[in-house]
């Protein structure tokens, strides 16, 4: 895919936002734009999750991916979605099952998110990235003490719904 001159909208969490990068110019979105000749629009917010939480606060990190789709520039040529690690790490939404269609389970939120993206960006390429490996990826109790599935199950859900 030739990206030169195209606009790529990146929807994600702290990794997309650039937390940990040595400077703004070294966020992966900016490096991608430099290497491809594209224009990067960064919609990353640290701590955010794909699924909605049971109790939503005014904090930025409670603005799940589904809440933010309408804020994305609809003229983008390509959309990249990179999330799921915070759903595993500290979310309170259960993973659910493939047939779910609610933002309150991970599977359901994926279905809702991909449907919203397809409606907002018809005929555009949508690329879905799975979470990076973590040291604690096999735990079944997350950082907030809430039962969860191992990270591999979140990766499988992302792949399954994206297909």
What positions do the PLM features span?
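Short intrinsically disordered, low-complexity coil segments enriched in acidic
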Residues: 1-2, 9, 125, 163
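Alpha-helical cap/lid subdomain in secreted, periplasmic
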Residues: 63-163
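Conserved SGNH/GDSL esterase-like catalytic core that processes O-acyl groups on lipids
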Residues: 2, 7, 15-108
